[in-house]
Amino acid sequence: MTELSLPRHWLFLRGLSRESGHWQPFVDDCAARLGWQCHTLDLPGFGSEHQRRSPLTIAEIRSDLQQRFALPDDEPFGIVALSLGGMVALDWLHTEPQRIRQLILINSSSGDCPVWQRLQPRALPQVFRGLVSRHISTQEQAIMKMVSNRHGNNAALLSRYVELRNQHPIQRRNVLRQLWAASRFRAPHTLPADRLLFLASRADHMVSWQCSQQLADRYQAPVALHQSAGHDLPLDDPDWLIQRFEDIAGKE
């Protein structure tokens, strides 16, 4: 894929229980270094949409985002998506292939992958802590330890994430509804390989990198593996990710 074939506009989608604020400063870095027009949308039930009920299917989440994405219908775009956001992106490409030029999927999965790879057993203690604790700081600390191999004890980052939670409270039922939607999602049978790039970390303690590998094999699409970052690759090694983005644009 050449630089000219890539879109100017890119939509960034987060995963389970996360919001657009968790992308920063990564999205701003992409805009500055790549010259992209970057957009973010919160999934229904989270972030700016926290007062809404989260749908029970990935297709409904995708449809909701389609209706809210303020871009002209004839303007092509790409999607950078993490984890559950990748499921939404795959479904979106399947339903609107004429608009979406490129998907970059980070540590994603689907119901076609074994359940112990979609949520690894070693992540379960932190998942449990995040769900049952009544204290936001304890919940966010558990999530950070689960998704990051480099910032699990970052006090400043924890403070920022707690502030996001205070601004946009999370309803436990919405987390469970997202989990249900993810568990039912099956990846489309066919998608154009030249519009797909899978990125994953071998050291992801939440979702096995093998899920990304299986999806890449399914579509005969390229995959690149990081050796040490955690599930939240944009947090753990943003430079590595941007270098991969530059690769598809033919930049050095």
Where are these regions (language model features)?
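Conserved HGGG/HGGXW glycine-rich cap/lid loop of the alpha/beta-hydrolase fold
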Residues: 3-51
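Gly/Ala-rich beta-loop-alpha elbow adjacent to hydrolase catalytic centers
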Residues: 81-85, 89
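Flexible "cap/lid" loop of the alpha/beta hydrolase fold
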Residues: 94, 103-132
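Conserved alpha/beta-hydrolase "acid-adjacent" motif
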Residues: 205-211
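Short beta-strand/loop motif that positions the catalytic acidic residue
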Residues: 192, 198-200, 204
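Catalytic histidine-centered segment of alpha/beta-hydrolase-like enzymes
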Residues: 229-242
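Conserved alpha/beta-hydrolase catalytic His-Asp/Glu region
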Residues: 136-189
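Active-site loop/oxyanion-hole signature of alpha/beta-hydrolase fold enzymes
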Residues: 37-78
